[in-house]
Structure formats: structure tokens, C-alpha cells
Amino acid sequence: MQSEQIYIFNPEHDLCIANGDENFVPPRSAMGFAEENIDLSEHLKRPNKQRRQIIPWGWNHSLKKRLANEGIDPATLPSEEELQFIRTHSRREFALDVHSRLSCRDSQVIGPDYRIVATSVSEIEDFISANDSAVLKSPLSGSGKGIRFVREKLSESDEGWCRRTLDKQGSVIVERRFEIMKECAMLFEC
């Protein structure tokens, strides 16, 4: 019996994975686009005449719970270990590690000290002080909510954001700010 593939466009995935709680409810703004373009419940309520392979934009605890509540057999959904693997490998630190292994020429262009993985506010402040400006990135984030641009020093708001991010996610990626020439993004299916 051939399996039916159900693709789920869940653009709120990054916010859900950053939050980590299966009961997290993303902001309405993050959900609107997906809701305008697909009615998931209609696909899931059809008689189960064939096996279904669910292929989301990204797996997270919120989606797993939502699908289980819609009647999908929990045995066909990712395990806790698989979800933790996805969360760990979705962190910016993982991408930085992979990047450092793939590109030896970049260190000649941008220098080995253009970014740090900070675990304290004082590390962040020292980096900004040494570089005049910086981009602060939370290890897990989505929809641009985990990126802040800072010039000269942390504002009260920036410092509060750093403390909350350090408390919840354990680190903040701090990079020298460069002039943006072009922005692009890619999506891979593995």
C-alpha cells in the first residue's frame, strides 16, 4: 500500500522550537499565513485508507501535540529523543560548528574573532566595546525575533533581552556587524 504524503506548512516552527513547550501558542501574526493557505484538519479527518507520511516544514513539540489531538497515531510521530535531536541541531551554535569545519577561507576574510558564543552579559558588553557595534542572536529563534542590532553599548532593553536569552537558552551569539550586501535564505530537506 502506497503512503500518502501530507505536507504541513508551519512557518511558526522556529518560534515553537525556540520556546520548547508543547503548549506554546505562537502569536497570531505567525499563524496567519499558514491558516490562509491550508486547512490541515480537513486532510487529517479523511478516512484512513492508506498510510500517511506527514512532512512538516519542521517538527516541534507543539506540532506533535496538535497532530496527536487531531487523531494521528502517536506511534507515527517523532519520539522525544528525535525532537530533542532536532532542537539541538537547530541551534545557531551547531550551524557555527558546521560552518567552521566547512570553510577555512572565511577566517582569512572575516577573521577568527568576528563572533563569540557568550554565556554572560559581561562577555557581550566586552565584545561590543571592542567592536563598536554587534549583532546579537539567540541560539534558537524565528521570524527575526531573535536578532538585535547594537551600537556602542547595550541599552536597558538589550540587556534585559540578553539576560532572558541567557537564562532560557544558555548563550547569545555575538557577531561584529558588517555592511549587508545581499540577504538570502535556503531550505533543505534531509
Where are these regions (language model features)?
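Short, surface-exposed loop and linker segments with low hydrophobicity and enrichment for Pro/Ser/Thr
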Residues: 1-5, 46-53, 129, 163-167
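N-terminal-proximal low-complexity accessory segments that begin disordered
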Residues: 2-39
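Generic beta-sheet signal
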Residues: 5-7, 52-54, 134-136, 172
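Conserved N-proximal alpha/beta basic substrate-recognition cap immediately N-terminal to
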Residues: 11, 29-130, 142
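A short acidic (Asp/Glu
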Residues: 16-24, 64-70, 145-148, 184-185
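Phosphate-binding site of ATP-dependent enzymes
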Residues: 132, 157-190
